[in-house]
Amino acid sequence: METKRVLSSSGSIDSISPLPDELLSHILSFLPTKRAASTSILSKRWRTLFPLMNHLCASLYLDDTDLLYPERQTEEEYYVIHNSFRNFVDKTLSGCNNNSLKKFSLTYEDDDVQRMCLTTGMMSKALEQGVSDLELYIYMPLMYEPPRLLPDTVFINNTLVKLTLGTELCLGRSPWENLEELYIHHIYIEDRDEEFNIHTAPHYIAHNIKKLTVCYNNDVQAPRILSIYTPNLVYLDYSDYLTCLYNSENHFNDLLEARLDLAFARAGRWGDEHDTCLKIMNSITNVQILHLSCFTVENLATLHFEGSEKEYWQLLCNMIEKSPKLETLVLEGLYGISDCEVGIDGGNMVKVVEIQEYKGRLEELNQVKCFLREMENLEEVKVNTSDEIENKLQLTNDLLALLPKRSSKCNIHVL
């Protein structure tokens, strides 16, 4: 169908005006909401298109960083601009068609915690529209006190399936009824108890959650304890200190993919986090995809590593790279590995390698070769063999042939 072209008052060809209102509203929906609203000043017709967009559109993205005049000149102008933004959000939500809005995203900055009640009002209006996907990012750069709690309606809403909470938002103590996806980014966790105590920590039960993301960028001045019971979790993305994650009831039996970016407090500042780490790793034994990263483990001197899967040994290389003071490495489970290339970037200071339950198979020898050629500071290699090994002298000669030139004086003990 050929589009009719209209000459504008300036003489140029206008291909927009002939389009139907519904199509123009759809085009507006691709603009940031505030920009779309600014088209209302173009003409009398355009004044009706933005409300129509809200009536038809299934998603709203409201961000005060997209204000038409974002420069903060004076304190008075700052409050005028942000009050205007809140009024704009309120009117925009009021113009939405009931049950048509599926996603609501709100991002803004405020220095007054007392106005949190206005924020909860915005959330309530969005939830009244039947929103299933709610995103909230509130920034309070000048506030030094905990923000107010989110309303219980956020957690017990019947339509909400996906919830994203970011910065300066405070979780209450309400359960999540129907959530399937939860994303937590640098939120404040309510804990009225002055003493750091796992038994009095906020406890959340979320039977339906399939995806959980917790991200704090390891930015914390005091310990946080968050206990979330998620028995049906299939995806976990966690980046923080370990005080926030582990619940003894969580075994993650259905977990298929996990991304762990773990941080450890200095000198056990908040308890034995390494024990917690071990519990977590033992609880994700059924995981199929594992992404593991952490900061440098500055003082780790001895590492005992056991694994019978190729992916585990690739993980070991990462552990060695992040342990600059590692001197003793104990390996077990080499018999389950074949064709696993080992590469350790940045060098290492490993002086002692101990291999347990060595069975003398070809794949084991190849795997030992991969590791030993990366150890240029080796002083001693201990091999604890199984009863299947008869010719220990030949084994010793084989291992000597694998050593890099810089470790040619290394002592080898076959036990």
Curated annotation (Swiss-Prot):
Pfam families: F-box (PF00646)
SMART domains documented for this protein: FBD, FBOX
Domain F-box: 13-59
InterPro entries: F-box-like_dom_sf, F-box_AtFBL13-like, F-box_dom, FBD, FBL60-like
PROSITE patterns: FBOX (PS50181)
PANTHER family registered for this protein in UniProt: (RAPE) HYPOTHETICAL PROTEIN, RNI-LIKE SUPERFAMILY PROTEIN
Name of the protein described by the UniProt record: Putative F-box protein At5g40050
Organism whose genome encodes this protein: Arabidopsis thaliana (Mouse-ear cress)
Lineage per the UniProt record: Eukaryota, Viridiplantae, Streptophyta, Embryophyta, Tracheophyta
